Amino acid sequence: MARVKRGNVARKRRNKILRLARGFRGGNGTQFRTANQRVMKALCNAYRDRRRRKRDFRRLWIARINAAARINGVSYSRLMGGLKKADVRLNRKMLAQLAVVDPGSFSNVVATAKG
């Protein structure tokens, strides 16, 4: 069987991790063993939070729409039900943006939902 020499493999593997750990504080960014643990943790957090971000933004949009809807005298659930009945195809992100940037237009949308 042929002899296998590792060459640069180990250094490349370590440098890949240390590149990912650049900017971490202290030994977490310079020492391979701690950097490896921190990078694995960071990647787990990133994976989890990419999914959490979607939930958080949806909650934010709903809170903004609800606040603006109540100013116009209707609850969030009645507003969304009315919009569905009126076949208004605005998603929550668009409604929240409308409520913040242009309250007058949002009032017109609420009037449409009220029927």
From Swiss-Prot:
GO terms for biological process: ribosomal large subunit assembly; translation. Binds directly to 23S ribosomal RNA and is necessary for the in vitro assembly process of the 50S ribosomal subunit. It is not involved in the protein synthesizing functions of that subunit. NCBIfam families: rplT_bact. GO terms for molecular function: rRNA binding; structural constituent of ribosome. Belongs to the bacterial ribosomal protein bL20 family. It comes from Parasynechococcus marenigrum (strain WH8102). Pfam families: Ribosomal_L20. It comes from the Bacteria. Keywords: Ribonucleoprotein, Ribosomal protein, RNA-binding, rRNA-binding. InterPro entries: Ribosomal_bL20, RIBOSOMAL_L20_CS, Ribosomal_protein_bL20_C. This is Large ribosomal subunit protein bL20. GO terms for cellular component: ribonucleoprotein complex; ribosome.
